[in-house]
């Protein structure tokens, strides 16, 4: 797709032009979009003329890397050079690749994809330094923070993080004319089913003429189209073994070719009932016939996982499938016919064909970016007055995807500790909660506050998203001294926590 390679970036300085673009940083493909002067969300083609840029990084020599390499170049590369699905590792502090003398984190590798998107778009739009970037609803705080860091490394000021289903719902509501129009306001319930290459989200959204409100959401950051491909890879590999062949997964080069062939077969089976997969391996030519019914049978458990999640979201919002006004498909993996069939059974209607599943998230990010621009003083963002008024009339309301809490201990048994949830999942944001706790010991030198994200009481099963200490306490504080903790979550997903002991009013925050 592109034969242009770029050096691994040093940390870039930030400019601050008025334009804000929307970016879908995807597991398999990424895209950048704007809202044009006619009010149309438009995805900007890359230098190869495609609206989609593969989220693949090919590591070269001399600290160079290529994003979205040509298929032939990728096929000739060594396995250790290929970086795919890096989005799944964002926020994982234990993951890093060694390339020469450099340690490549998921944030740095993701920044290369963002840099490619920015540089390609700048050839058409001029300087780009601000963006809204989308993430799966079920990304936790560490993953969201890592996404912002990736943008910063790429020289982008990430003015907001928006959840992918919300972005898609914005695109649907905007392009259908249901959002931002003057007239009678009718509330509609929209189910957004987002099955991408590496992540899955399902969200129930309520839309009126001026308001978009998320009612419930759930998902899985480790479930996506690549898992269907992997399952097909296992099936074909076992068939080759049954024919007396050597397991193709044992050779990294052959394993890569098999995976690519299975990806192609998966896509073909979305359009045809039968396909044949061919693979040369260990001096033999193998030919495996695959049918859509067999593919759907061996991946039925994966689809069922998405159905279970969808039913859970409907139950959380107290909505029956038959009460849905529309079902919107997002993500390239929704092209699999089994997805449409399952959702039609669940909702009693076929999913909408209004949106392009692979572009709608980037388009929604661009609409959200334009809404933010419209609220800035002295900035017109290239939009006319009527369009600006339409954008200014829109409000959105999200919910948090994970419960937020603090670690507490038993006063009589300090080894006993648990997660005390202060903001339950699916709470409308922004929100702020204040609760009181007490100290466990006499004359403490500091009060340690540990912030957790998770749905269970077991601390070890939760994610630690931060910690801080309240120090310089008054001397002689008795056990049982009250401590006030204030937990806040803003519209952009920023978490702020403050703690104050109520005798000397000493406080700290993070």
Task: Show the residue positions of the predicted features.
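Short, hydrophobic/amphipathic alpha-helical packing segments
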Residues: 111-118, 303, 307
